[in-house]
Amino acid sequence: MVSVVMPAYNEEEIIENTVKEWYGEVVSRITGAELIVVNDCSKDMTGEVLARLAQEIPALRPLTPERNGGHGRALRYGFDHVTQDWVFQTDSDQQHIPSDFWRIWEQRETSDFVLGVRSTRADGPVRVLITTVMRMANFVVWGLWIRDANCPFKLMRRQAMEKVLVRIPRDSFIPMVILSILCRKMEYRVTEVVVQHLPRRGGEQSLGGLWKWLKVGSRCLRQLLALRVRLLWGRGNANPIGNRR
């Protein structure tokens, strides 16, 4: 009934606990559920840990793309392999609480997308600033006030998700931010649910200091602007907005 998808990169310290927590709290309690972990060509023992766990947990499906592509591409790779009617996106860094899933899950009957909103960001002022800037950029570029477009805690009806993703270039750096925008523009039923956010307990952060974050922010803004133009004119990989069927 649900495919839980999470990317992982150099998470050997915490990936076993992450998998066991999500399996015990969520996957084992839903008939037919699967846990897809995309090992984004980690340089540590993440892949080996996942391979061992897959022998113990049949619902675990570890996947490894041919090359490292970053968080966004790893998610798209995982989405390509889901088998269930609902898709849940989360991260493997243990900054979210698996039990919060049920608060999201209970909204599915009246929603196509249920999007988590972090109550507070627990990973430092730079990331809080980036979230604020992203919120303002979405308003300026798209005319939408989205509280937490990049929160990695989203439940999506698979059929609707696929119709949104086809409009997002596969090499997008921020596919889930754009998905948060397009599902509203395409007039799907969207619900927001406040969820907890914890400090990272281990593993490796994918992004570094302030200078790198500034470059990331600039790249995100360029992609938002470029996609806005592409969608407006119906060019490239993205179709014009307006018909979600």
Task: Label each region the model flagged.
Residues 33-36, 47-81:
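Conserved donor nucleotide-binding strand/loop of the catalytic core
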Residues 96, 175-182:
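Short active-site alpha-helical segment characteristic of glycosyltransferases
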Residues 168-171, 180-198:
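Catalytic donor-sugar/metal-binding loop of nucleotide-sugar-dependent glycosyltransferases
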Residues 1-3, 34, 178:
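Cell-envelope/extracellular polymer assembly enzymes that use nucleotide-activated donors
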Residues 11-26:
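Short, well-formed alpha-helical segments that are part of the catalytic scaffolds
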Residues 13-17, 44-53:
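Acidic helix N-cap motif at the loop->helix transition within catalytic regions
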Residues 39-48, 94:
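A conserved acidic beta->alpha catalytic loop
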Residues 65-81, 86-88, 95-173, 200-221, ...:
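Acceptor/aglycone-binding surface of glycosyltransferases and processive sugar-polymer synthases
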